[in-house]
Amino acid sequence: MLNDSQAVRNAQDLNCMAVPVKYRQIGDFHEYYSGARTVPYLTIFVGGNHEASNHLWELYYGGWAAPGIYYMGSANVVRLGPLRIAGLSGIWNGRDYKKPHFERLPYNSSDVRSIYHVRELDTRKLLQIRTQVDIGISHDWPRGVEWQGDLRGLLRVKPYLEDDLNNGRLNSVAAKLALDRLRPAYWFSAHHHVKFAATIDYSKEENGSGSQKQAVPEEQHRTDTQQGTATKNEEEIDLDLDGEVPVTSQAAPPETLKSSNADEINLDLEDEDEEPSQAHDDIPTVSEDLRAQLPAAFSRPPANTSTEQLPPPPGIANKLTRFLALDKCGANRSFLQILDVKPVSQHSAPAPPQKFFRLEYDKEWLAILRVFAADLTLGDPSAQVPPDRGPAHYLPLIEAEEAWVEANLVQPGKMVIPENFELTAPVYDPTMGINVQGQPREYSNPQTRAFCKMLQIPNPFHATEEEVQARMQAGPRPDDPRFEGGHRGRGGFHGGRGRTRGRGGNRGGNRGGQGRAWQR
């Protein structure tokens, strides 16, 4: 699943999910969490932007959200039989991309949203992979993939995407970096609530015959990731604004497009960075002569080129990636597709035939996690993420850690992911209903503790009872003023969204407060 799965265990988890109160539903995940129901098939998912983020945060490195339902964590690579699967959770926001994971319970209103913004450090780990993967999954689409499919068909049913498309702000920079590095046979995403297929032919790009449009977002990538003020909050896409209609790939006939669902309510009442002024005549400038007299410390630091698209390493040889996004679940919607996937990754030895495959750790990925474990900080907005030192720095470190993984985990036969799910938070109590006050406490997940112990890395997610209680008594940090409700139509958890791109009353007046049922 590519999500939003909304892995809500109880009513308090709903208070940590970026969905307006009047649209919240408990759903049925809690039944799988409690064991009342079981999934018929192994299910793997990444996180999106409508999640019980406090629950998924317990499983930052990946783990079982419920029996048979495996969350990939913020970023991950796992194996399932002959397949090697990479995943990246969250959605793009240039403002938060290079920040640390500063959110920690109890959350303020801005934390509830920023916690699911993908971070550069997590993306950086994926960019160290040097061998082929078969499948990549993300919630947000990789930026630029829209140019490789039926773009006109997409814009016919999602016309509000055109502004972001023309300004190079559509979709995820992080997912594109991962896609271009990993080049899997398949990449699956969700987020826009529409079926869309595309093909990325890297052989054309290497020969210089690729689409010129692919280069357009690349410049914007560097602008988004290097500037502290993004033009707007790029991840907040009008998913339901025009009603949800499946869009076909280039090969599909146009008559399969259905009329829009006018009764559907948009839930992405998210923060938007204010559009910058187009004119900057009032900003004072400094002459180059005066700049030359300043000490070297006043010079602008060189741009970080680590996000530049580099040639793939020899171990990544696939040239064709098939991209597929599906609609959200619902009647007469294209939300399910069955595919036969032929592995393109190489294995040192063929796996013996098995009736059922079990998830396994990935040797290279575990080595990467050991290299980067000390760089992870939690709950501190003032912390600085260590800079990207580039592949030449990380490669020998990763190779050394691979030798450790081989000796300590591969050879002893410890690479199968244990089915060690345990309840942490209480299960849902229907007698209490869903409108409960307060946020849940923080839980130290035994799966994360076991994983960190296995890898012999620090576990910053574990806190003593005294630390948890002290944070709860202190309460949330002061809120970011961008998220204080009432100052404009999209503020906080208040207001509706109109069909126009305007702010304030236009957005709130057109769709807000109509009492329509929310469709996920």
Regions found by a protein language model. Name each.
Residues 1-520:
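Extended recognition/assembly regions associated with phosphoester-bond processing machinery
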